[in-house]
């Protein structure tokens, strides 16, 4: 997901019951996948395999769209992906994969062996978001659950994980059917809890790289809500940022709102801290070194005329290097405590949640160049953006680089060409982004792009010995 919500996502523990009924694909007109005007002939290797992939995919696409719609209608939150994981495990068994469930919680590992050769890991994420869907789609989610605080929330696949899962299953079907085109092992993983950046670590801690074939390469695809179907983008090197969660408990001395002089007001102190934190970015950081310090939540007080004893601040912090990360986290602690000292208040508690830290995502440059060249052959050079700017969103896919495994994540367009063109006009409304209640990717062409590119990338990395 490239953006997480600004506020810290709560760990949700209640169980969601999902209907097992299988919906038929809803008949929704889909625009044709755009074809570049000057698409050059791809090399013979690519042409032959792409034709075989497309032939297999043509016979699978209707069922993959139905799978997508089922998953979209029945989303499950982080750490609650029980039915989603079971459905994916069942789908992968049908392809002939050796499937293991409950790896690191709700994780699924499906191994497809096909003779000697390298090992390629292909990841999909499975969890949805606490968002009430407003797309108006006939297969829109109406799911609501209670979070751990007892608050009822809507649940929606608003980050494209449903597209990722359908493409993942489609890629497994294609590779299983075309074993004569490649040699080696593919490890498909269905990862839970990406939205709270916990699932990758859980699966690795559960022995993903010791109990199953260790990958020579790791691949992932992600939806892009701002570009048209049939296009994709990727970065060489830095792709996404470090992400840290910081909680600050601001302490004061409560009392009557009419007598502030006999209190130490933590609300005023918290407001000062919020403003002072912005100087970390504006006055302590090189303008060319990207840093984000966002206060996503502030809570304190119970009534108009009561000054509380404490205020809670919740921060998300984004950096791109280890040195900058360490410096920014120390600055947050220093600024919060200095503000309290100036207000004659008790020192605040500043806690960095290591459980919710995820390192920056760096695409292996050689792997990115290799896959990028292949994607240009598949889609045409003008449909591939190899200079996609890094974003300050975070992805725990970065953790699969453990043990120096080269990783590569790329982003496929998911909106119609018409919507994209309209959005380029002056004063046009912004397109619905990820983590919004209106994000509605086009299923069929998005899934096609995901399956075509991922299947060919796997084949490229798993060459058949002549």
Where are these regions (language model features)?
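Bacterial N-terminal signal peptides that target proteins for export
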Residues: 1-9
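Bacterial N-terminal signal peptides
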Residues: 8-19
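Histidine/acidic-residue-rich, glycine-tolerant segments that coordinate divalent metal ions
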Residues: 144-156, 162-163, 175-297, 302-308
